[in-house]
Structures are given as structure tokens and as C-alpha cells.
Curated annotation (Swiss-Prot):
HAMAP family (UniProt xref): S_AdoMet_synth1
Gene encoding the protein: metK
Keywords attached to this entry: ATP-binding, Cytoplasm, Magnesium, Metal-binding, Nucleotide-binding, One-carbon metabolism, Potassium, Transferase
InterPro entries reported in the protein's UniProt record: ADOMET_SYNTHASE_CS, S-AdoMet_synt_C, S-AdoMet_synt_central, S-AdoMet_synt_N, S-AdoMet_synthetase, S-AdoMet_synthetase_sfam
Keyword RNA-binding: no
Cofactor: Mg(2+); K(+)
Binding-site residues for K(+), renumbered to this chain: 44
Species name: Levilactobacillus brevis (strain ATCC 367 / BCRC 12310 / CIP 105137 / JCM 1170 / LMG 11437 / NCIMB 947 / NCTC 947)
Name of the protein described by the UniProt record: S-adenosylmethionine synthase
């Protein structure tokens, strides 16, 4: 049992420079998968004032106008005005793409198991790299996500909506939110202690108006009233001015918001980013599978909280380890859960791709506001269709 404590998570808007990069990388990935579902993609993006650089390794039968995809993505985010120091019509776009290394491809196309004579087609694809991936679920929200990251994402979605609908017409695309939640001694959320929200804005709006609008039109409609009280602290644009933002204010790079993308720091992270990678990259696909497993375990009420680790060797199909941790909240032994997971979930890369239908162009929509706990889009790793099977396996 813990004492009362505070825990904080953050989110960033789709106009944050790192998130611009993530969305461009995933928009390119989706465009390639739409033409060639077997595309091998490792697409990185960097953005700065007036410049986008797209680079990486891609092997595909598809043809995609990368410049067009980049510019369209930037404009959809809201960078449509040269005053922002970055806009989709006028920025330079440089492309430096190579093919996937044949040394890597030989281990992905023909796994160690296949080379040793295994005829199972799901054993053919080896992991695209070594690595460890985590998935997590907790019963403190309906989405089975930690509350601080859920609230942070919700604030960012709300402020983007108000900007795009011109309700607050002085808003610009870059923004960040951070929410601190107080937990009781049973590790259940009690209240929101602090909300930090910084939003880019036009130069002529006053700080007082921004603060009033953010509290009344962003925070209060988003965070349930029973979580806010007279002691809740609000820090709105605490530097006093946020006119220069986006890539003009900070360079952005694919894969630099891995905690925003996942659980807001409430769970461990293996270090691998998601965006711009096709599903043979287990950094992405195995993280989705681990979330799928953890969410189904918690949804089955086999634990209140669950973290799953999966690890791989490059070029080998079967994971080298699968670990289930329920933090003392499980109703069955963790070893029994791990056995059930191995039996019910095919964690070979080809098995994950088949189980979650990952060759589709579904990735750009995940590149802002988190890859997990989403209710606004249908993501297969958020389904709880393994609950009955897990319950039966753990009797």
C-alpha cells in the first residue's frame, strides 16, 4: 500500500514539432501501404524553420509523391500561414531515402526458423530488430489507461478542436498540456492537483484572455468537475508569451515523444519509437500486441493493473521472452497468466500482423494524441475480444 502521492503525465498537440514529424512519417507509411501492403518502411522526418527533411530506408513496389504527402499533412495540421515561420506551401522538402539493408532484409524475409527448415508460414518473418517492448493497462479509466495521460490527451484534442473551428481564432497549432493527479493510499485517483497548459497564439491577444479562455473553454469542459476543486492549480502559458512556436521555435524529429505516445510514464518503455515503421518492426507491432494483451487481462478482471514485456532477437520469429507483471493486483498467478498469453496470442511478427491486421494504412491517425486508449478511432489492439478466452484459460 502506498501513501497518497502525485503522478504527472504530459501530451502535446498535433502542431508540436516532434508530432509534425511523427505525422509526416506515418502519412508516408500509410500512402505506401495503401499501394503495397508488404512495403518495408523506416521513415524518419526532421522539421525546422522553413524546412522538412525526410530520410530513412524504404523497400516497396509503390510510388508515392512524398513532397505532396508532406505538404498536405502540414496543411491539415494547421500550418497554412507564412507568419508561423513554417507552412505547407512554402517550406522546402528534402528527401533522402535508401532501400532497406539486404543484411536486415534477409533475416526479416527468412527467419532463423525458416532457414533451419521450419515450414510454418507464420515463422517465415523474423523480427526486424532485437529489442524489448512493453504494454500496459490499468482499471482507473474506462479506456483502461492511466488517468493523467488520458486527461492530457483530452486537453490537447479539445484545444485543437477550438482552434480548427475558429472558436478561439487567435490560437496557433503548437501546444502542450501536463496534468498532475493525486492518488490515494490504494493507488486510486482522487483529484487533479495541477494543470499546465501552454498554447501558441497570435501576438495581439492578451495573456489574461488566454488564461480565462483556456480554463473556461478547454480545461473545465474536459476534466470532470468532481476531479477539480478550489486547491487545483492552473499554470496557463506560464512564460507569459508563446507566439513563436512549431518548427520555428524548436526543431522536431520523428520518435521523440515516445512517452506521450504510450502511457505518460506510468509504465516502462523499451525505447523504440512507433511512427514511420511498418509492422515487421517489432518496436511498433509488439508494443501494440503487448497493449492488446494487457488490456484484455485487465478487462477480464484477472488483474487491476498489468504490464507485459515481450523481447525479440533480430531475424528470429519467436520472442525470446514474455513477462506478465500484475503488481500484486492479479487474481491468478502471473506464471499462469504468462502461459495463457503464450497459448492465446501469437507473438511472432507474422502472427501479430495477422492477429491485428497491421498491413493496412491505419497509422497516421495514431501519430497524435496517443496510440493507446483511443475511443475516437477503431484500433484493433484496443479490442477486448480475448476476455472470455483468457478467463477460460486461467480457471
Amino acid at each position: 500500500m502506498q501513501e497518497r502521492h502525485l503522478f504527472t503525465s504530459e501530451s502535446v498537440s498535433e502542431g508540436h514539432p516532434d508530432k509534425i514529424a511523427d505525422q509526416i512519417s506515418d502519412a508516408i507509411l500509410d500512402a505506401l501501404l495503401a499501394q503495397d501492403p508488404d512495403s518495408r518502411v523506416a521513415c524518419e522526418t526532421s522539421v525546422t524553420t522553413g524546412l522538412v527533411l525526410v530520410f530513412g530506408e524504404i523497400s516497396t513496389k509503390a510510388y508515392v509523391d512524398i513532397q505532396k504527402v508532406v505538404r498536405q499533412t502540414i496543411k491539415e495540421i494547421g500550418y497554412t500561414d507564412g507568419q508561423y515561420g513554417f507552412d505547407g506551401d512554402n517550406c522546402a522538402v528534402l528527401v533522402a531515402i535508401d532501400e532497406q539493408s539486404p543484411d536486415i532484409a534477409q533475416g526479416v524475409d527468412d527467419s532463423l526458423e525458416t532457414r533451419e527448415g521450419d515450414a510454418d508460414p507464420l515463422d517465415q518473418i523474423g523480427a526486424g530488430d532485437q529489442g524489448l517492448m512493453f504494454g500496459y493497462a490499468v482499471n482507473e479509466t474506462p479506456e483502461l489507461m492511466p488517468l493523467p495521460i488520458e486527461l492530457s490527451h483530452a486537453l490537447m484534442r479539445r484545444i485543437a478542436m477550438l482552434r480548427k473551428q475558429a472558436v478561439l481564432d487567435y490560437l496557433r497549432p503548437d501546444a502542450k498540456a501536463e496534468v498532475t493527479v493525486e492518488y490515494d493510499d490504494n493507488d486510486q485517483p482522487l483529484r487533479v492537483d495541477t494543470v499546465v497548459l501552454s498554447t501558441q497564439h497570435d501576438p495581439d491577444v492578451t495573456l489574461d484572455r488566454i488564461r480565462q479562455d483556456v480554463i473556461e473553454q478547454v480545461i473545465k469542459p474536459t476534466i470532470p468537475a468532481d476531479l477539480l476543486d478550489d486547491q487545483t492549480k492552473y499554470f496557463i502559458n506560464p512564460t507569459g508569451r508563446f507566439v513563436i512556436g512549431g518548427p520555428q521555435g524548436d526543431a522536431g524529429l520523428t520518435g521523440r515523444k515516445i512517452i506521450v505516445d504510450t502511457y505518460g510514464g506510468a509504465a516502462r518503455h523499451g525505447g523504440g519509437a512507433f511512427s514511420g515503421k511498418d509492422a515487421t518492426k517489432v518496436d511498433r507491432s509488439a508494443s501494440y500486441a503487448a497493449r492488446y494483451i494487457a488490456k484484455n487481462i485487465v478487462a477480464a478482471e484477472l488483474a487491476q493493473k498489468c504490464e507485459v514485456q515481450i523481447a525479440y532477437a533480430i531475424g528470429v520469429a519467436e520472442p525470446v521472452s514474455v513477462y506478465v507483471n500484475t503488481f500484486g493486483t492479479g487474481t491468478v498467478a502471473e506464471a499462469k497468466l504468462a502461459t495463457a498469453v503464450r497459448d492465446l496470442f501469437d507473438l511472432r511478427p507474422a502472427g501479430i500482423i495477422q492477429m491485428l491486421d497491421l498491413k493496412r494504412p491505419i497509422y497516421k491517425q495514431t501519430a497524435a494524441y496517443g496510440h493507446f486508449g483511443r475511443t475516437d478511432i477503431d484500433l484493433p489492439w484496443e479490442h477486448t475480444d480475448k476476455v472470455d478466452a483468457l478467463k477460460a484459460a486461467c480457471k
